[in-house]
């Protein structure tokens, strides 16, 4: 089957998501705030807040960066050029010093959550005596220092990674480090400024063409790398149920009907394209830069009898998307636009607007961040940019996205925030990953396993607590001739979309809950 389909590396199995292990630490009673007990998610045992934007003053920082070079220039009798010279020399060191100092001395946002104060050594096992002596008791280790040491094998968790990370406020500091600032200034920012086409291609293919088994070992048989949707908070739905819920929600929110021309930008392994084609009769074009994903998506559609004339996956840059006469009736983009970058975001939206039929619908699922940030959020974001999604610099607060969408000419019909749904999805991905530990380490090494272990565990927490989140935004063109009345019956929230489901999810699940990729391809 691998030769016939053009897909390689199918000699792996999907696992059934295992139960979460018993917590390694005694249950914390009366932590100071109410906690939840829902089966659908990994409930937070210690939901503490840290310091952040409420104690950070941009005006003071800008004043320092402006006044100090001017004062130095004045002292030597210089003018504007001399001031500019001193700014080049002293502003970066002052900026770093400011970040290091303020992030270290700022108090927690509130003290509502009572920390157990067990000491760093209760949670971490350092390999070197110097580290054991340095980080113990209340002398907490900076988060960036910790994860770099963890990836290098210089420290281990005393227990399950996710469980120890849940207690992180008791053993870690979120103050900035020299390494974090260095990466931001000289690693991330140049990419944000440049963000070239070749950079996009290199980063996407390095990430997504690593190996289908690498992703299959945590994504499961749906091979969907975006948030699922919870339909019932009082039971633990499977990962596959969460993803099937999401597929349904997308198709119902856009009012998909048989024969609709649909474009899925950043389609991944093509599961949404196949679902929309098979369950709704749509004519779908999926676009991805991943070669492995292209082969997988086309093979899976041919397997179930969807002809290429109806639907296909193409391996192209989004800037080269083929457009049919009249445009696409429905356009979807799930967690791809963040990779476009801040520099190109408006031009990307303009392109989508131009490709969309005047009475069409655009659905954007967008991973964003909160505006009232905490230092933990920034530390996590820089980790993600360095190790997981390099170049995905357009993860922003909702207001920024809405402003760009409306400025491009879209009218927003509905917005749902699905961060906690993402946490539920990540929790299941994490358990799959841990269950495949031996296989991952044997093929990709312990370092790659640890990076993804940390990513999946930490992101389960981050998306649950609001540091990062995800938005579903449904839009039409904001022009006078748009038939807005046609969209009234499909102006759904999450549960409205699920209640209106026109897909045969039972049949879909029966065909797709498989043990090996070969059964799909």
UniProtKB/Swiss-Prot annotation:
Return the CDD domains for the record.
AdoMet_MTases
| Summary of the knockout phenotype | Produces 65 to 75% nonmethylated and 25 to 35% methylated GlcCers. Exhibits severe growth defects and produces abnormal conidia. Also exhibits drastically reduced disease symptoms in wheat and much-delayed disease symptoms in Arabidopsis thaliana. A double-knockout with its paralog MT1 is not viable.
Q: Does the keyword Transferase apply?
A: yes
Q: Which residues cross the membrane?
A: 60-80, 85-105
Positions contributing to S-adenosyl-L-methionine binding: 225-226, 262-270, 288-293, 318-319
Keywords tagged on the record: Lipid biosynthesis, Lipid metabolism, Membrane, Methyltransferase, S-adenosyl-L-methionine, Sphingolipid metabolism, Transferase, Transmembrane, Transmembrane helix
Q: What is its EC number?
A: 2.1.1.317
- Look up and give the membrane topology term: Multi-pass membrane protein
* InterPro entries linked: SAM-dependent_MTases_sf, Sphingo_C9-MT
Specify the pathway: Lipid metabolism; sphingolipid metabolism
Secretion signal span: none
User: What biological-process terms (Gene Ontology) are attached?
Assistant: methylation; sphingolipid metabolic process
Q: Does the keyword Transmembrane helix apply?
A: yes
Please give an example of a GO cellular component term from this record.
Answer: membrane
One GO MF term attached to the UniProt entry: methyltransferase activity
**Domain of life where this protein originates:** Eukaryota
Q: Where in the cell is it found?
A: Membrane
What catalytic activity is recorded? a (4E,8E)-4-sphinga-4,8-dienine ceramide + S-adenosyl-L-methionine = a 9-methyl-(4E,8E)-sphinga-4,8-dienine ceramide + S-adenosyl-L-homocysteine + H(+)
This protein's major location comes to: membrane
Q: What class of enzyme is it?
A: transferase
What the record says about family reads: Belongs to the CFA/CMAS family.
Question: What functional role does this protein have?
Answer: Catalyzes methylation of the sphingoid base component of glucosylceramides (GluCers) at the C9-position. Sphingolipid C9-methylation requires 4,8-desaturated ceramides as substrates. Glucosylceramides play important roles in growth, differentiation and pathogenicity. The methyl group at the C9-position distinguishes fungal glucosylceramides from those of plants and animals and may thus play a role in host-pathogen interactions enabling the host to recognize the fungal attack and initiate specific defense responses.
Q: Which protein is depicted?
A: Sphingolipid C9-methyltransferase 2
Gene name?
MT2
